[in-house]
Structure formats: structure tokens, C-alpha cells
Amino acid sequence: MVTPLNVPRDIRVTADEYGSPVFVWLGSRQRRVVRIRNVWRIDDEWWRQEIARRYFEMELSDGSVVTVFQDLISGSWSRQRY
């Protein structure tokens, strides 16, 4: 059996009025976003099941670096590990 790697996991995010993350929850702990390093968008597979995501690579108040994305169709947030 093949197990997918780096499957996105749902994550709780608080965004500002522009849609940029300002807080994320890792487990039960809230972390403040200190800096957004990179932002990019992926729009794909419109002919099947549309994918529209905005990704953020960011530094958090505990020193960790995480990548999250917002599904622009559903509005949900997920963490993507690399």
C-alpha cells in the first residue's frame, strides 16, 4: 500500500482584513505570525475539480517556519509540510 506524503492538515488561522494570516494554532497553542516570507497562488484542474489556493510561508513567534494555504473556494485553511 502506498501512503501519500505531506498530506495537508486542517489548521485554525486568524487572518487580517486583507486575508493574510496573523495567528495560527499549532495543536492547542496560538502562535503569532512575525513575518510572511513568501506568498503564491495555485489555480489548477479547472476541467476536473477546481483547485484555487493561496499559500503563505511564514515565521511564527516561537521561531518556527510553516507553510499554510487557504482554499479560495471553500475558505478553509490547511498546513502543508515540505
Provide a role label for each language-model segment.
Residues 1-82:
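Non-catalytic peripheral regions of nucleotide-handling enzymes
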